[in-house]
């Protein structure tokens, strides 16, 4: 089988499983081919060095990356067609300390191809109702917990005739109806700069990929205070931690109270059918402001309900009882 056919087959199989990433990773004198599905990374295959080298070179060639460079970091991208659908692939390569190259391929899906299943749709509705108030809605949860997918689906359901602008690093989902901007530090386009540009475009809704620093936090707060609906994510262990994180980034209690409409916490939890569902919990700012420690009671009740419905095992519920 030709190398092109091997790569095509591998990528198409990854897309069938809705994998987010495909990895070529050196291990001894072999390469591991791995795929990431939500929170789980599994070994797809083991291949020899020469076969891996040929497959990686083919990928790099069609992504317009330098074949001769195997140690320094490189990035590339390409469109990929499978069936009637088009996908966007983002490639990243780098060599390890022995000079063996690794390659990661991120698969960017269209919003129409990404579907989120929830344990409790009432929580989704709660956050949707919060969105009518405008202001800042912050999602928290570990990397790979489906936050961006949920945000995109929420916004897509409510904005049939509104102007939506996204600012991300990098773009994770393709949606042609949104104006999507990507952070580019080399070009002097960081989150803060793009939010300022975005305000001049006067969108109805902002999606800011992540608040990572004080300047981005301040810019997102200003956008929310100026009458926009702003969705974003923050790294925090629980919903109360979101408020603490904003304070750590220099946002005053007064501005948080004025701008923060709601907070959501989400995890993707394995189900008994071998798939995953999102456990989502939403809170208005007033529910959280006086909490010193987050009360996981409602979350744990949701897990108990899922166990009774035989959607998750008791062992899985115990593993996720504190988020």
Residue ranges and their predicted role:
Residues 1-323:
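Short, flexible helix-loop junctions that flank or precede catalytic/ligand sites
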